[in-house]
């Protein structure tokens, strides 16, 4: 026992679990607060699992919708790995535990693992002096939009795989990193974009930060001389390709996950620029105006991260945000905080502030999260 107490990893895990417990206690306390204000008697499980959570619960219980089903919102848009893991635990518990409970346990375990390895990787992945590591779990558990990681949503698992990808990348364990990328692409399609982060980091590890045609040529030659690195690049999108193969046999359309999304929105705007212009100038709903400006702020943050030499992370963040912006700003707040790297950017900024400013900003972020949690309990459309 004394050896365990002296173990640095055990101490770190204990601190993370304390922060985690505080964040979940806030969620529990907000249930009677919400019920008291709104005059309802809803349970924690009911309030935490809105919209897509119900879709995932259906998949866990029944599998994917058959092509002959009349529901226009077929659940093929939801990638399978999270549901498969939940199915596994539901099966080994004999189906005795509520599906939402299983899903929330999986999500919460994933975000704890993510926070642990995020802190472990902080020293290698950032340029901040020691002493601020525990800011990361505070951000990951209590920053705005992090309540999704406690629900039956894929956010927590997706974040976990992204954290592990960058952790192994910093250790130069490229195959392990890309296995994590493959798992992330089986959780959400955006996981495929980690291949760009991999290529950026491989270039830096081989050629340094200098960019020239000679360096690029040397990088390409070096890559083709190293089958292990080529293999690592190729397996990044394996999860997504596996799901597309399944869809091809299941419903005859490998792109069904994309094509079915017209059931949620059929707006058509010019990709990225047109989407942001319409949103930021108030030509669509007010909530989308907010999301448009939110996206611009996040792009500035990623630019800051690139300036601070978080090259691989910032490239992943930028591309992962631009993809949804090809069609709409809907859900971009959730998507952004679900890619993890935004936490690193905020962490970097906070770590450079003096103590008072740092904790004031952190406190404001927690208050915003509590307000958003209330909106979530109220199924507010601003969170769609």
Name these PLM-found stretches.
Residues 23-35, 39, 195-212, 216-316, ...:
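Membrane-lumen/periplasm interface segments of specific transmembrane helices
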Residues 50-65, 71-95:
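Short hydrophobic/aromatic helix or loop-helix immediately within or flanking a transmembrane segment
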Residues 73-76, 93-116, 285-292:
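Loop-to-helix entry region of an early transmembrane alpha helix in multi-pass inner-membrane enzymes
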Residues 97-101, 118-142, 311-315:
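Transmembrane-helix signature of polytopic, membrane-embedded enzymes
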Residues 105-125, 300-304:
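Transmembrane-helix motifs of polytopic, lipid-linked glycan transferases
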Residues 110, 130, 134-169, 183-194, ...:
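Multi-pass, polyprenyl lipid-linked donor-dependent membrane glycosyltransferases
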Residues 126, 130, 165-176, 206:
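Membrane-interface transmembrane helices that cradle and orient dolichyl/undecaprenyl
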Residues 233-237, 352-382:
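Signature aromatic-anchored transmembrane alpha helix within multi-pass, membrane-resident enzymes
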């Amino acid at each position: 026992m004394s050896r365990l107490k002296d173990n640095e990893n055990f101490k770190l895990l204990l601190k993370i679990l304390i922060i985690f417990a505080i964040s979940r206690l806030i969620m529990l306390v907000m249930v009677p607060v919400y019920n008291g204000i709104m005059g309802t008697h809803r349970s924690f499980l009911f309030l935490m699992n809105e919209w897509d959570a119900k879709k995932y619960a259906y998949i866990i219980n029944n599998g994917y919708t058959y092509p002959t089903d009349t529901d226009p919102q077929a659940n093929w848009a939801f990638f399978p790995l999270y549901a498969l893991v939940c199915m596994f635990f539901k099966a080994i518990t004999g189906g005795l535990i509520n599906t939402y409970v299983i899903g929330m346990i999986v999500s919460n375990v994933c975000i704890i693992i993510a926070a642990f390895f995020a802190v472990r990787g902080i020293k290698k992945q950032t340029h901040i002096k020691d002493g601020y590591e525990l800011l990361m779990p505070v951000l990951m558990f209590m920053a705005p939009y992090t309540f999704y990681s406690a629900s039956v949503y894929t956010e927590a698992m997706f974040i976990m795989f992204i954290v592990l990808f960058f952790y192994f990348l910093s250790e130069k364990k490229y195959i392990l990193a890309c296995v994590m990328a493959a798992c992330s692409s089986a959780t959400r399609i955006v996981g495929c974009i980690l291949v760009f982060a991999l290529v950026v980091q491989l270039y830096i590890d081989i050629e340094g930060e200098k960019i020239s045609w000679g360096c690029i040529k040397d990088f390409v030659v070096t890559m083709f001389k190293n089958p292990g690195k080529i293999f690592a690049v190729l397996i990044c999108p394996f999860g997504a390709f596996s799901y597309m193969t399944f869809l091809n046999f299941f419903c005859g359309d490998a792109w069904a996950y994309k094509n079915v999304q017209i059931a949620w929105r059929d707006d058509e705007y010019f990709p990225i620029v047109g989407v942001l212009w319409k949103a930021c100038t108030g030509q669509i709903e007010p909530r989308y105006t907010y999301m448009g400006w939110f996206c611009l702020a996040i792009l500035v943050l990623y630019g800051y991260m690139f300036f601070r030499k978080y090259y691989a992370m910032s490239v992943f963040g930028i591309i992962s945000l631009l993809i949804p912006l090809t069609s709409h700003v809907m859900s971009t707040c959730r998507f952004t905080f679900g890619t993890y790297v935004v936490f690193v950017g905020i962490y970097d900024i906070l770590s450079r502030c003096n103590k008072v400013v740092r904790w004031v900003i952190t406190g404001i972020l927690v208050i915003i999260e509590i307000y958003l949690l209330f909106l979530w309990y109220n199924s507010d459309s601003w969170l769609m």
